[in-house]
Amino acid sequence: ESRTWTQDLYLMERVCGICSHVHSMAFVLGVEKLANVQAPPRAQAIRELVAELERIHSHILWLGVAAHEGGFDTLFMFSWRDRETVMDLLETISGNRVNYSANVLGGVKVDINERQKDELLRGMDFLEERTRHYLKVVTEDDTFLGRTRNIGMMTFEEATRLGAIGPTGRASGLLRDVRMDSPYAGYPDFPIQIVTAKAGDLEARFVVRIKELFESYRLVREIVEKIPSGDLTTKIPRRIPEGETVSRVEAPRGELFYYIKSNGTDRPERVKVRTPSLCNWASVLTTAIGHKLADMPMIL
């Protein structure tokens, strides 16, 4: 609360190094709502583009870490090698491999040209081919299934009662995704097709995340091919009108919630952040009961 709105934008990006873009997007969308300002269509599409690239990065990173915790270090190394592809693409667009600083109040400060569009399409083709291999591994490899199938079970009813969100909830059959329930940024123009599973075990959580990668590849291609022309920013007052609002976006791991209160000055009176991992902690006990200690790293 001691920093200006613009200074806070860079602070919010550093709440999470893996999902810095969605944190800044949640913040700017909330501030823009208070100021009654809407970013131009091209800026909204770029916000969605970077968000989906960030989701790809997060899911591949998660796949590698989970594989490592289960003792599958070859899958860990292969997936993290492929993760470099999307990190290079994010660097091509923003200049940074982490903390992309794409958002500004009122729009974005990065754009994509024809060369970058070609690189994005080639990157999606490569990653899609690799992801097909990962899906085959997590659904057909007997050794892998021995560590994931019927492990860490959470039923639809339990997920509903515990408020599970993100891929964790969707792996138990919950139709919860902020991009679908309350579309923001470019999602009204480039909507998602939600991915769910019913089993509610570790295997289902792997499958949901990997299938979400295919959906992100589709969205990136669609945005690249149909991105609207126009400005990247619109004017926004330095002093944000008095009021309070909430801003919700779908981070890679679930709903990210921002509460923002303005007192009419160039500084916020209050900003409260609730991350998706905090919501999913409530489900850990349910998914862990009856399993071995060695299963806990993958369950977590």
Which positions does each model-derived feature cover?
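Active-site bordering "gate/hinge" segments
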Residues: E1-L300
